[in-house]
Design a protein with these regions (language model features):
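Solvent-exposed loop/turn segments connecting transmembrane beta-strands
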Residues: 156-163, 189, 211, 234-244
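Cleavable N-terminal export/targeting peptides
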Residues: 1-31
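Transmembrane beta-strands of outer-membrane beta-barrel pores
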Residues: 44-48, 90-96, 137-139, 146-152, ...
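Residues on the lipid-exposed face of transmembrane beta-strands in outer-membrane beta-barrel proteins
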Residues: 40, 71-77, 131-135, 169-173, ...
């Protein structure tokens, strides 16, 4: 029996924005300062895994738990006025250990909320600091630096104390009504339990993969209020190529109630260098 408990609580979110107080939802004011925002999120996380009733963990430890608190600060500027606008995004994050101990976390356990030292003990704290410069021309926005991509093939994770981030270049375009295009090339990432901004890529198919870069491109098209389509492709260098097709469907049942569904198809093709027997010939899901 495997009992697993994950409790997350966002205690306080502080948002400070400058500019027009009555700005319409989803819109940002023009100008570097007028369109800027600052958010501070306090997050409390307790993680527990109990293998003592029959099932043993891979590390041989029957009980693991960690309790930690995270503070996540984000600043997003607006864009300077003019044909080409420039801006800056920045973040500072801090993770604090509240309770754990030897044999319950780190290298000797199965929970890795906090980083651990050479003795296998959870660190008392860790931090992340990063940012990106951005530019906007008409309906195209480019970011260079530490970014948080959201797509079916490359997506930052936010299920632990502090979120993941990637380092590289991303581009988003919305010139055509109903169509959003995005792509990027990323050469490293920051895992959720480390201060490093140059970790290897964490993947769904094979865990952490040693690859020099990942590139992706695709788009989402909204046909109407009820139907949408998505097509994406990505390449993890020296590992695999991935392809995605999906639909989103919504059927209104009442003014504020709708039935939501969709179809998702993934195909991953091994480049032949991964050397994982279960991956040869590719995967479909």
């Amino acid at each position: 029996m495997n009992n697993r408990t994950l409790l997350g609580l966002s205690l306080l979110t502080l948002s400070v924005s400058t500019g027009q107080a009555a700005m319409a939802a989803g819109e940002k004011g023009e100008g570097f300062i007028e369109g800027s925002s600052l958010t501070i999120l306090n997050r409390n996380l307790y993680f527990n895994r109990d293998f003592r009733k029959g099932q043993s963990s891979s590390s041989g430890n029957g009980y693991s738990e960690e309790w930690a608190h995270g503070v996540i600060g984000r600043f997003e500027s607006g864009f300077t006025e003019g044909t080409i606008g420039f801006g800056v995004d920045a973040f500072a994050m801090l993770g604090l250990k509240l309770d754990t101990g030897d044999g319950r976390s780190g290298a000797g356990g199965t929970v890795d909320v906090m980083p651990y030292n050479s003795l296998g003990q959870a660190e008392d704290n860790y931090s992340k600091l990063g940012g990106a410069v951005k530019t906007r021309f008409m309906d195209t926005e480019i970011k260079v630096g530490d970014v948080f991509p959201v797509s079916p093939v490359v997506h930052y994770g936010d299920a632990r104390l502090l979120p993941e981030s990637f380092r590289g270049v991303t581009v988003v375009n919305s010139s055509v009504e109903g169509l959003s295009l995005q792509g990027g090339r990323l050469h490293s990432m920051s895992q959720p339990n480390t201060s490093s901004m140059r970790d290897g890529f964490a993947t769904f198919y094979a865990g952490e993969v040693d690859s020099p870069w990942i590139a992706y491109f695709g788009g989402d098209y909204t046909l109407n209020d009820n139907v949408g389509f998505s097509l994406y492709t990505s390449r993890l260098k020296d590992a695999w190529n991935q392809y995605y097709a999906g639909t989103t469907l919504s059927y209104p049942l009442a003014d504020d109630v709708a039935l939501i569904g969709g179809l998702n198809y993934y195909k991953a093709v091994d480049e032949g260098k991964l050397n994982r027997p279960g991956f040869r010939g590719g995967l479909n899901s």
